[in-house]
UniProtKB/Swiss-Prot annotation:
It holds the Pfam family Sdh5. It comes from Idiomarina loihiensis (strain ATCC BAA-735 / DSM 15497 / L2-TR). GO terms for biological process: succinate metabolic process. This is FAD assembly factor SdhE. It is found in: Cytoplasm. Keywords: Chaperone, Cytoplasm.
Length: 90
């Protein structure tokens, strides 16, 4: 029964994560939601922590970073942004 409980917790966590990825901007929604569905499970625990940190950033900053209008100074976040852009085709 323990593996099932872990699986249920993982699903609950992923549902919460998908909810947190719903942004106020469509341009960000089309990046974050498919990434969670398609690639999040493949990330290492360290990468998942970086992703969770990324989604706490403000929408204007995220938009500027993903659209290439500004450079993200945090190298871990910048690497996650590059990875996400390589995985999600819009």
């Amino acid at each position: 029964m323990l593996p099932l409980k872990q699986s249920e917790e993982a699903l609950k966590d992923k549902r919460r994560l998908r909810w947190a990825c719903r942004r106020g901007m469509l341009e960000l929604d089309v990046l974050f939601e498919p990434f969670v569905d398609q690639a999040y499970d493949e990330l290492s625990e360290e990468q998942k922590a970086v992703f969770r940190r990324l989604i706490t950033c403000d929408d204007p900053d995220l938009f500027a970073w993903f659209m290439g209008h500004q450079k993200c100074e945090d190298e871990e976040l910048a690497e996650m942004i590059r990875f996400m852009l390589s995985r999600v085709k819009v």
